[in-house]
Amino acid sequence: MRVIVQRSQQAQVSIDGKVRGTIDHGFVLLVGFQDGDGQAELDYIAHKILNLRVFSDADGKMNLNIQQVGGAILSISQFTLYAETRHGNRPSFTAAGNPELASKLYDTFNQQLAASGVTVATGEFGADMQVSLVNDGPVTICYDTDQR
């Protein structure tokens, strides 16, 4: 499982010109799965994201997590995080997880985040989406469960 976390001031996702999800300050997550991912990966990444202290405290130090600042999450599925680019100029996506399983993992992951009390907006798994955001910082963190 791979997740790119971007701290944002605001973000939204649209599908076919219609806004599907929007947040004010919080995180934009780009989420990808590979075959073999399961509940252990979801638990690990959800814990890391919910406890990630990249929001400023009163002294301007990155010391607060998303729950402490009342932030929200915009979660976007993105199989292209598993692009293979070592050979040629056109990426291969064979390392990305089976779409049927990945869709279930994506839904479970978002439910797990929401169960913590954080508002979670989503795109649509497998859809062609337009994502817009205002990066804050910018702060971008990459998680890969193969590297834990």
Swiss-Prot record:
The gene name reads dtd
Which superkingdom does the taxonomy of this entry point to?
Bacteria
| Entry protein name | D-aminoacyl-tRNA deacylase
Q: What does this protein do?
A: An aminoacyl-tRNA editing enzyme that deacylates mischarged D-aminoacyl-tRNAs. Also deacylates mischarged glycyl-tRNA(Ala), protecting cells against glycine mischarging by AlaRS. Acts via tRNA-based rather than protein-based catalysis; rejects L-amino acids rather than detecting D-amino acids in the active site. By recycling D-aminoacyl-tRNA to D-amino acids and free tRNA molecules, this enzyme counteracts the toxicity associated with the formation of D-aminoacyl-tRNA entities in vivo and helps enforce protein L-homochirality.
Reactions accelerated catalytically: glycyl-tRNA(Ala) + H2O = tRNA(Ala) + glycine + H(+); a D-aminoacyl-tRNA + H2O = a tRNA + a D-alpha-amino acid + H(+)
Q: How does it assemble?
A: Homodimer.
Which GO CC annotations does the UniProt entry carry? cytoplasm
One Pfam family matching this protein: Tyr_Deacylase
Example GO molecular function term?
Answer: D-tyrosyl-tRNA(Tyr) deacylase activity
